[in-house]
């Protein structure tokens, strides 16, 4: 869940007040997407999503924000999406693509500043490792640099979620993606 979600905020308040070594955070790096995951885009494109909806979402990321924040700024009360996006939605696939796009956040790394002492674990979310050995949507080089500078001294695991977007009759490359992610982590950690 997002750091601005009321349930997350309630948990954070309890965590801080109790200051127990048994309460902490597991941060999901999916909150640091720089781009919409390409595997999701390709999957919805395969299903027939309107290319204009796809481009609309890509433009939001390219502008330096994410759909969740952009929609919150542009929406009129009672509407899920801005009017210009609603006009482009022609099918359930378009609607789902736009709705799910709000789950890929572009948070500033410093959102973690006050929580570093409470972070017990990092879920290194990956959707697609490229041939160049980097995650397509998330800059792990930047994430790890931030965590090092902030004093984080815990674990980063690999959480592969690209499998949910694999096209029919295509192999799920889960092992290959996890291995590539672990190699990338070692490289950025200097191991």
Regions found by a protein language model. Give the residues of each.
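Active-site segments of SGNH/GDSL-like serine hydrolases
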Residues: 1-2
């Amino acid at each position: 869940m997002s750091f601005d979600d009321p349930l997350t905020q309630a948990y954070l308040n309890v965590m801080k007040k109790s200051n127990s070594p048994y309460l902490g955070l597991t941060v999901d790096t999916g909150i640091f997407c720089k781009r919409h995951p390409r595997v999701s885009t390709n999957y919805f494109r395969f299903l027939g999503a309107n290319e204009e909806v796809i481009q609309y979402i890509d433009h939001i990321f390219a502008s330096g924000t994410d759909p969740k924040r952009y929609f919150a700024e542009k929406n009129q009360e009672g509407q899920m999406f801005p009017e210009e996006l609603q006009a482009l939605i022609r099918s359930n696939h378009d609607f789902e693509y736009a709705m799910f796009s709000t789950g890929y956040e572009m948070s500033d790394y410093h959102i973690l500043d006050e929580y570093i002492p409470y972070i017990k674990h990092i879920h290194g979310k990956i959707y697609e490792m490229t041939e160049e050995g980097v995650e397509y949507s998330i800059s792990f080089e930047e994430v790890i640099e931030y965590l090092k500078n902030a004093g984080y001294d815990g674990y980063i695991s690999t959480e592969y979620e690209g499998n949910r977007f694999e096209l029919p009759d295509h192999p799920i490359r889960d092992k290959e993606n996890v291995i590539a992610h672990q190699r990338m982590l070692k490289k950025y950690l200097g191991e």
